Amino acid sequence: MVNTHVNLPGLDLKNPVMPASGTFGFGDVPAAQKFDLNDLGAMVIKTTTPHATTGNPQPQIAILEDGVLNSVGLTNPGVDQVISEKLTKLRHQYPDLPIMASVGGDSEDDYVEVAKKLSASGLVNALEINVSCPNVAQGGMSFGVHAGVVEELTKKIKMAVALPIYVKLTPNVTDIVEIAKAAESGGADGISMINTLLGMRIDIKTRKPLLGHNMGGLSGEAVKPIAIRMISQVRQVTQLPIIGMGGISTAQDVIEFILAGANAVAVGSAHFEDELAAKHIVEELPAELEKLGVEDINDLVGQVKFN
């Protein structure tokens, strides 16, 4: 019997597979209601901000040959309503499922406020800190591109909450290792990586970008080699747990990410092609591990053999 159980700070996972933040909303989107979320290792909810946020102009999503461009934005009803309605309903439906909430904001104070409220709710097991949000005080530059800002933000949130926190790293940086080290110095309990790569596509007939917001985040197959490279680099400088993401659509992908250094994974864009992608990956994983003669998935973490 292959062991796929993974134990991370705050998250006791029966298997290492969860949906990427935003994929299943707050458990209220159609895809999330087509199967039992208890089949997954955990549920990660959509990024939550202090106040209700509307999304970006339409179109918000462009399906490409090898990935997805999205500029959906952090559409959510605000933290108070997320707790009183969305999370309360999700937790009632799934009393034993590990739930990770995703925290966003325009300022450090925003992040701390949302983190404190989510932590105090008692409805979630861990927090993912989405540092890809634009920092209004810094002219709109993403929080996650500056090591000093990441360290300080992580420290402030860590001091304010008792829950484990996972800092979600943006790949839109020169050196992701430096940012990962900053998150660890700030007291992060784990790292999620990678968020989407900033991209743009243009319709040559209309000469307009495909997205209403012009630019958006690229995810899916196209970013997989970048995600694997970055996870491998970060694994060499930290022992922190890593939740890996970026183009995972098969059980083989899960194994590849774990060999690179991830402890668990999140599946996002694959759900555009297969609404049950995460469920199917969970079902296929034990057989794929058996083929490789692996008895415990945890034994594979960071075991890539470099040339």
From Swiss-Prot:
Domain of life: Bacteria
Residues engaged in binding substrate: 46, 70-74, 130, 195-196
Subcellular location: Cytoplasm
Pathway: Pyrimidine metabolism; UMP biosynthesis via de novo pathway
Any Pfam family: DHO_dh
Keywords of this entry: Cytoplasm, Flavoprotein, FMN, Oxidoreductase, Pyrimidine biosynthesis
Main location: cytoplasm
Gene Ontology biological-process annotations: 'de novo' pyrimidine nucleobase biosynthetic process; 'de novo' UMP biosynthetic process
Gene Ontology, cellular component aspect: cytoplasm
The reaction(s) this protein catalyses: (S)-dihydroorotate + fumarate = orotate + succinate
InterPro entries on file: Aldolase_TIM (IPR013785), DHO_dehydrogenase (IPR050074), DHOD_1B (IPR033888), Dihydroorotate_DH_1 (IPR024920), Dihydroorotate_DH_1_2 (IPR012135), Dihydroorotate_DH_cat (IPR005720), Dihydroorotate_DH_CS (IPR001295), Dihydroorotate_DH_I (IPR049622)
EC number: 1.3.98.1
Cofactor binding note: Binds 1 FMN per subunit.
Necessary cofactors: FMN
Protein function: Catalyzes the conversion of dihydroorotate to orotate with fumarate as the electron acceptor.
PANTHER family: DIHYDROOROTATE DEHYDROGENASE (FUMARATE) (PTHR48109:SF1), DIHYDROOROTATE DEHYDROGENASE (QUINONE), MITOCHONDRIAL-RELATED (PTHR48109)
Subunit-structure text: Homodimer.
UniProt similarity note: Belongs to the dihydroorotate dehydrogenase family. Type 1 subfamily.
Name of the protein: Dihydroorotate dehydrogenase A (fumarate)
